[in-house]
């Protein structure tokens, strides 16, 4: 299996690849070495995705703080 070290083109591409990796790992059909390689790639993609999400959150906070009178409000999702 070729090693994929390149960062995906977008967050969505990384998420799609990560979902495919999870499906392959959950199938239980991979040899141990391949499963470890897939897991390693999955961790790498998850970390890259987290960085992209943090960058997006920072951009949103910057955009919201453009108003001189408004203080930036941290994003907190509604718990349902």
From Swiss-Prot:
Main location group: cytoplasm
A GO biological-process term: DNA catabolic process
InterPro entries for the chain: Exonuc_VII_S, Exonuc_VII_ssu_sf
This protein's record includes keyword Kinase: no
GO cellular component, one term: exodeoxyribonuclease VII complex
UniProt keyword terms in alphabetical order: Cytoplasm, Exonuclease, Hydrolase, Nuclease
Subcellular location: Cytoplasm
Any one GO MF annotation of this record: exodeoxyribonuclease VII activity
EC number per UniProt: 3.1.11.6
HAMAP family: Exonuc_7_S (MF_00337)
Family statement drawn from the similarity comment of this UniProt entry: Belongs to the XseB family.
Alphabetized NCBIfam families for the sequence: PRK00977.1-1, PRK00977.1-4, xseB
PANTHER family membership: EXODEOXYRIBONUCLEASE 7 SMALL SUBUNIT (PTHR34137:SF1)
Protein name: Exodeoxyribonuclease 7 small subunit
Lineage, top ranks: Bacteria, Pseudomonadati, Pseudomonadota, Gammaproteobacteria, Enterobacterales
């Amino acid at each position: 299996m070729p090693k994929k070290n390149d960062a995906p083109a977008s967050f969505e591409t990384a998420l799609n690849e990560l979902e495919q990796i999870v499906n392959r790992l959950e199938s239980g059909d991979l040899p141990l070495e391949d499963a470890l390689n897939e897991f390693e790639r999955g961790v790498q993609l998850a970390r890259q995705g987290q960085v992209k999400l943090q960058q997006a959150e920072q951009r949103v906070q910057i955009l919201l703080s453009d108003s001189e009178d408004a203080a930036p409000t941290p994003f907190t999702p509604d718990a349902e």
